[in-house]
Amino acid sequence: MNVALIDPTARVADGAWLADDVEVGPYCIVGPDVTLEDGVRLHAHVNVQGVTTLGARTQVYPFASLGTPPQSVHYKGEKTSLVVGTDCQIREHVTMNTGTASGRGVTRVGNNCMLMTAAHVAHDCLVGDNVIFANNATLGGHVEVGDNVFLGGLSAVHQFVRIGAQVMIGGVTGVREDVIPFGYAIGQNANLVGLNVVGMKRRGFSKSELHAARAAYRDLFFGEGTFAERLAGLRERQDASPFIKALVSFVDAGGKRALCHPSRGVVAQED
């Protein structure tokens, strides 16, 4: 631990492990079970507690509070953890809780994530890589978020919901059901309004791949027969498209929540 990089007003408990080039700014508090890897910077007034690991080059801004106990009535003081990946930007007033013994025991946030002001990650969440939380975006307990997801400002995700990779959640959206990979969901009670086409283009999807994805979306949600029959039809075609394969795998995996659908009366998204 390089003492020269710790502001004299900061408090770093005995037992904390800090890499040599970590910077701990004014009035930060670091608990005894915290690990700060290479290049981590706590700017000022940051609180890091619990069994918490912050990955290399992650930066944490003033008044963020990480690794505090889960907000669960079932928590009885068990030693659970928080793991944050590399190269994350954790902005002002962000909160992240550790896991619960009755859940995963750990809350995980992936690499290269940005959590804007006052975002919240609750106990036992699993967040993938390259995820962006806009201001005040909130995850309830046990939520799973795939890679490259964008959560709009003031959005709220109900506990145990799964959000697939590449999803866009609109601002001020309440998500109570699982959202398919590449989906775009908005509304006070979120409904699908199509695919996250802008995100797919940014990820290099070709015109033919976008056409196939839109066709599969229409077939699943607007086709003939029951939902189970339409899903079975896609299952037979899943080797033809990475999108279809990801879609079928997500639905087949299931979860504790229902699947988010388009609202009634919505017209299928056209090419």
Curated annotation (Swiss-Prot):
**Leader sequence segment:** none
Listed EC numbers:
2.3.1.129
- Pfam families to which the protein is assigned, alphabetical: Acetyltransf_11, Hexapep
Which cysteine-cysteine pairs are annotated as disulfide bonds in the entry?
Answer: none
GO CC term, one of those recorded: membrane
Q: Which family does it belong to?
A: Belongs to the transferase hexapeptide repeat family. LpxA subfamily.
Outline what the protein does.
Involved in the biosynthesis of lipid A, a phosphorylated glycolipid that anchors the lipopolysaccharide to the outer membrane of the cell.
- Give the protein's recorded name: Acyl-[acyl-carrier-protein]--UDP-N-acetylglucosamine O-acyltransferase
Q: Which organism is it from?
A: Azorhizobium caulinodans (strain ATCC 43989 / DSM 5975 / JCM 20966 / LMG 6465 / NBRC 14845 / NCIMB 13405 / ORS 571)
Q: What is the lineage of its organism?
A: Bacteria, Pseudomonadati, Pseudomonadota, Alphaproteobacteria, Hyphomicrobiales
